Amino acid sequence: MSGVERGVGQAPAAEFTQSADLVLLDVDVYRRSLHLIDCLTLAVGPGRILGVSGASGAGKTTLLRIMAGITHDYAGSVIRPEGRTAFVFQEPRLLPWLSARKNVGLTLAPDTAGKLFIAEEWLERVGLADAMDLYPAQMSGGMRQRVAIARAMATDPALLLVDEPFSALDKPLARALRDDLRAIVAQSDLVTVWVSHDPGELDAISSTRLHLDGPPGGWRID
């Protein structure tokens, strides 16, 4: 999904031109009468990583869903980059009856030229060249998360949304996967928004930091 999207009753963000940027203009978010985000305005360009922090319930995942166009329960305007949006979640969310290769290929359209080649290429890039035919139950947690990264990047996204991807892994493995994903993002001209509770992780990957204070909607950009 791309272009300008508006929350209920808002004027268009006419002053922004459609481009490769992710733009939020005066985004206001309530949940069950709680004011989570108050008039957030920001822009993230290609090749940049916006790191998002905040306490549980502050609205981090809700903000990702707004950026993705999954939820429309907000006021304000969102301009998304032209192209696909991809996710990397805390849980890999792989289909247990499919191999690594087929889990990655599943995100590609049936008529995608070289579908299996694309899946294999990305599995190689995340270090799983020898594990393409393994099923999720045969993989470690780190391997499953690498498949999830390959699956997201195989779609050639313009916008990558990353939600606590390594919080369930031990610190050395989490650090290695973080560095791998950061390197992949650096080689791709895409906009990335990365949510984490780990300040060290966000320090390592962020071009810009957004902290959500939660109710009554405060936030700050570093």
Predicted feature locations:
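A short, proline-enriched helix->beta-strand linker immediately N-terminal to the Walker B motif
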Residues: A154-A158
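The feature captures the beta-strand-to-loop junction immediately N-terminal to the Walker
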Residues: S53-A55
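ABC-type ATPase nucleotide-binding domains, specifically the catalytic core motifs of the NBD
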Residues: H72, L98, K102-F117, R125
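Conserved H-loop
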Residues: D189-V195
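Helix-to-loop junction immediately C-terminal to a conserved catalytic motif
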Residues: A68
